[in-house]
């Protein structure tokens, strides 16, 4: 377990947090820019001196009389800007971390294979793409034999394809190494796709924490739908890969969904997805003759209006919840109300 009570003042900004987190899975530290996410992560890593205490798995990292330096905390840190040594090649960057690490359970070759960096080992840092450099930075953190991984906005600055690529690697790392991870982000979609739990921050304080799906469901009820465009974390099982159409077939509570092909996932594996509310349309009768391939029946659970006459509709599908964001005019035309059967229409590309 990670326990931390920290206070720190920087100019007009004050960090004041009290955390109790289980040492498993991927936990997001989420909130708007400037809320203190990176400051908190650096304090936990020992890169920033603060008042308070930090304890990890029973070991005191910081209290009134103790401050274990960053290099002794067994915490692997992945910086937003990677911090790789440009004068060394990839292999030497990894060796720099490996040679200074205590012996641990993480095997060097496993890291190389899992992150797909074998072909990069002889390359110089300056010649790497953004996604390649990020994989090397993650590999360097792992070969240092950490007991916990701390990641500061690791997808920042990457294009969409590279982000999806790195998210896939991060999911595999979580499954393969079972290393507890704290993941700083202000992007709700990447958090929903990757993280099991969330810590919500605002103005230097923790305002909520819990399972990702529950926290995002709370955000769907906010009156500020511009700040939180909303959506749902859904879990669907991989049932087939349709290579002829470059699609993966998913099972959501007995209903078929088609997503862009994810051949890295095994048949029977459960996939965690984020479905943005803006990408869900609604119908009161099953439509025909549409290009949209995903039609999921459900029941209207709640309707929540914002100040701009937009309605966020919660649709219950078995034990999961989808959300659609529509206009008030559309809601009234469909006569939507709790308990009404509807069909949720989802484009396959929305499940990328």
Could you say what each language-model-derived stretch is?
Residues 254-304, 321, 325-352:
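Glycine/charge-rich catalytic "coupling/switch" loops of P-loop NTPases
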Residues 143-147:
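A short, proline-enriched helix->beta-strand linker immediately N-terminal to the Walker B motif
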Residues 149-153:
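Catalytic Walker B motif of ABC-type/P-loop ATPase nucleotide-binding domains
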Residues 175, 185-255:
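Internal alpha/beta loop-helix hairpins
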Residues 124-128, 132:
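Conserved ABC ATPase signature
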Residues 59-63, 103-120, 126, 171-172:
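Conserved ABC ATPase "signature" region
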Residues 61-76, 100:
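ABC ATPase NBD coupling module
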